[in-house]
């Protein structure tokens, strides 16, 4: 059995996708330099902001996220799990929360659309309701050999 090193990246995402991509790349590069085989980005790595902005950006942001993951995997020669990012769903009033697993060669290995949506009232009084604008996917399991 060979050694395998995974890196779990933590970010403080904002409503500015470009700055989020820059911050994510810095962490991916660091993880790769330290020998990571797999880099996991957090949910909402590319955008964390108002629902109305997320819905407006969803189609563009979904493409940007997929391209970003492919570029990073190839550039740093790591497998990347891009934790949830918004993808348009239905009539445009909902998004799916999608994660993609991309191989070192930039090939999409697996895709997962979130099933269990999260609702909470934060201590600062701001409610967070994925169920309001989030689409629900169907259960499914994919097993991938990333070697």
Regions found by a protein language model. Name each.
Residues 6-9, 20, 28-57, 73, ...:
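Active-site beta-strand/loop signature of hydrolases that rely on acidic residues for catalysis
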Residues 1-6, 143-147:
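Beta-strand-turn-beta hairpins that frame and shape the catalytic cleft
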Residues 61, 90-147:
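Active-site catalytic loop in hydrolytic enzyme cores
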Residues 28, 66-69, 141:
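Generic structural signal for well-ordered alpha-helices
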Residues 18-25, 62-63:
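Glycine-rich anion/phosphate-binding loops
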Residues 47-48, 88-90:
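Active-site environment of divalent metal-dependent phosphoester hydrolases
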Residues 62-88:
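A short, hydrophobic beta-strand-centered structural micro-motif
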Residues 10-16:
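Short polar catalytic/cofactor-binding loops
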């Amino acid at each position: 059995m060979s050694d395998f090193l995974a890196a779990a990246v933590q970010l403080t995402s904002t409503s500015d996708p470009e700055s989020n991509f820059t911050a994510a790349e810095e962490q991916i590069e660091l993880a790769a330099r330290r020998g990571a085989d797999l880099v996991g980005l957090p949910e909402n790595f590319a955008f964390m902001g108002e629902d109305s902005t997320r819905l407006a950006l969803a189609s563009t942001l979904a493409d940007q996220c997929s391209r970003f993951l492919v570029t990073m995997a190839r550039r740093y020669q790591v497998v990347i799990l891009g934790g949830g990012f918004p993808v348009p769903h239905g009539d445009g009033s909902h998004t799916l929360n999608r994660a993609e697993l991309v191989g070192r060669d930039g090939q999409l290995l697996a895709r997962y659309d979130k099933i269990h949506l999260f609702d909470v009232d934060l201590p600062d009084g701001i409610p967070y309701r994925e169920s309001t604008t989030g689409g629900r996917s169907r259960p499914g399991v994919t097993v991938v050999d990333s070697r």
